[in-house]
């Protein structure tokens, strides 16, 4: 207990701690806080206040967990084709209203812009990509379609880190289309890369510094990467010396840009390489315990300490420690598994949660995430997505 008469009290902005000022040394006492109440008291400050504490307050400055409002959005097979919810340490909030103009049909890919001022989806029918302003109030009025549309089903979508470009992976040649992006929406389509991917594009990602764009696709080499600049695509990087073993559906760069991972068909289902300014390095060793089957999505945690894979057979999602040496020993499966084929996976911006889009209701499943792996499953969102979720994305806006 505090050691004297309590004088003031305050919660941290993310609700994970509570502090009390009081008479008698140490004059301030703090505890973890959760839905179960008080946790074990934190150690006293090394330098104590000099006398009775009269007031206490938590600051947002420099704290990425408390300086943002967070959101989670899902691409889905059935109308309204995209849904979004507030996100917090408690899990899903009440669903935002649907956009006034819905995507045309099944959404396969979804992405917030880096500053979360926009939310974009890739979908099956024209215009094959739809984008909306995003704010704490939810969806804004849909941006005008790009003047030159992707030519067939949009499957993957990504914004460049500086939000100056948006790229769509799609199933018909040229297999990837990219556009300038601004607060006004889509600009004039960039020229196609001189050397195209070799088959239908399913996933796309930019490197963290925005200097590279990579596409996961059908057909060897299954992943194709290009330099990226304000002028668009550069000359294709050489293929990796050891390619993935089948058609690829997801691609992701590590947060430090030092690795690239590809998820797809055929064992080992996940393939990762060092990445540098010269392109692909020598393939990392496969994880000792492979994902159970064909992989559909891949994501690194924001701090780069973990990598997760969504796949087609139980446990539907597999996660591993990640380091400069590659894969670590697989984390234990979550105690409550997703209910069907894992299609997409993503970590929250602060790395405290992980969400999986999948077949079978509830269609999206989320867990706390820590250095120990999966925590106890969050309650399902209400209302649920009304059909399976091929992709999931988190966003956040500074308070």
Mark where each language-model region is.
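Blade-level signature of beta-propeller repeat domains, shared across WD40, Kelch, NHL, RCC1
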Residues: 365-368, 386-399
């Amino acid at each position: 207990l505090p050691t004297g008469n309590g004088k003031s009290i305050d919660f941290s902005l993310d609700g994970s701690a509570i502090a009390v000022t009081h008479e008698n040394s140490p004059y301030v006492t703090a505890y973890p806080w959760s839905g179960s109440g008080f946790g074990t008291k934190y150690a006293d400050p090394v330098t104590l206040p000099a006398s009775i504490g009269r007031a206490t307050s938590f600051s947002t400055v420099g704290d990425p967990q408390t300086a943002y409002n967070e959101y989670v959005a899902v691409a889905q097979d059935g109308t309204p084709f995209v849904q979004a919810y507030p996100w917090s340490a408690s899990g899903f909030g009440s669903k935002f209203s649907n956009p006034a103009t819905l995507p045309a049909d099944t959404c396969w890919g979804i992405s917030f812009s880096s500053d979360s001022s926009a939310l974009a989806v890739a979908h099956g029918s024209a215009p094959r990509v739809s984008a909306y302003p995003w704010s704490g109030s939810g969806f804004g009025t849909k941006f005008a379609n790009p003047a030159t549309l992707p030519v067939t089903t949009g499957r993957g979508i990504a914004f460049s880190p500086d939000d100056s470009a948006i790229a769509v992976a799609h199933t018909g040649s040229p297999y990837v289309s990219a556009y300038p992006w601004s607060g006004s929406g889509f600009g004039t389509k960039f020229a196609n890369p001189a050397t195209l991917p070799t088959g239908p594009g399913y996933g796309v990602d930019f490197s963290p510094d925005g200097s590279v764009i990579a596409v996961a696709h059908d057909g060897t080499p299954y992943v194709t990467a290009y330099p990226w600049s304000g002028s668009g695509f550069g000359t294709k990087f050489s293929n990796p010396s050891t390619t993935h073993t089948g058609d690829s559906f997801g691609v992701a760069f590590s947060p430090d840009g030092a690795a690239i991972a590809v998820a797809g068909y055929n064992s080992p289902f996940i393939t990762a390489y060092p990445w540098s300014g010269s392109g692909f390095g020598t393939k990392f060793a496969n994880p000792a315990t492979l994902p159970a089957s064909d992989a559909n999505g891949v994501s690194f945690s924001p701090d780069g300490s973990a990598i997760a894979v969504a796949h087609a057979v139980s446990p539907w999602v597999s996660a591993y420690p990640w380091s400069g040496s590659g894969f670590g020993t697989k984390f234990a499966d979550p105690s409550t598994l997703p209910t069907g084929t894992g299609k997409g996976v993503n970590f929250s911006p602060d790395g405290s949660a992980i969400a999986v889009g999948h077949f079978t209701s509830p269609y999206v499943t989320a867990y706390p995430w820590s250095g120990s792996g999966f925590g106890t499953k969050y309650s399902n969102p209400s209302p649920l997505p009304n059909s399976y979720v091929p992709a999931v994305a988190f966003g956040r806006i500074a308070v």
